[in-house]
């Protein structure tokens, strides 16, 4: 499975709905993610992709849409 599909699957699980048609929607403005679910997202991404995404370095503006999460994960994978 490609990074995009795996990230969308993780997001769908955490958010509890299919977000595949909301790829540029802001999670935080829409209320789909809060601080607890953000930590869960980062931990799931670290585990799935063997990357480091420390909460202490989290910049909400870089992770606020599905497309941005995918781009960030791809950049961390190298």
From Swiss-Prot:
The modification O-(pantetheine 4'-phosphoryl)serine is found at residue 35. It is found in: Cytoplasm. The keyword Phosphoprotein applies. GO terms for biological process: cell wall organization; lipoteichoic acid biosynthetic process. InterPro entries: ACP-like_sf (IPR036736), DltC (IPR003230), PP-bd_ACP (IPR009081). One of its GO terms (cellular component) is cytoplasm. Residues 1-77 form the Carrier domain. It comes from the Bacteria. It holds the Pfam family PP-binding. Keywords: Cell wall biogenesis/degradation, Cytoplasm, Phosphopantetheine, Phosphoprotein. The keyword Cytoplasm applies. GO terms for molecular function: D-alanyl carrier activity. 4'-phosphopantetheine is transferred from CoA to a specific serine of apo-DCP. Pathway: Cell wall biogenesis; lipoteichoic acid biosynthesis. Belongs to the DltC family. Carrier protein involved in the D-alanylation of lipoteichoic acid (LTA). The loading of thioester-linked D-alanine onto DltC is catalyzed by D-alanine--D-alanyl carrier protein ligase DltA. The DltC-carried D-alanyl group is further transferred to cell membrane phosphatidylglycerol (PG) by forming an ester bond, probably catalyzed by DltD. D-alanylation of LTA plays an important role in modulating the properties of the cell wall in Gram-positive bacteria, influencing the net charge of the cell wall. This is D-alanyl carrier protein. It comes from Leuconostoc citreum (strain KM20).
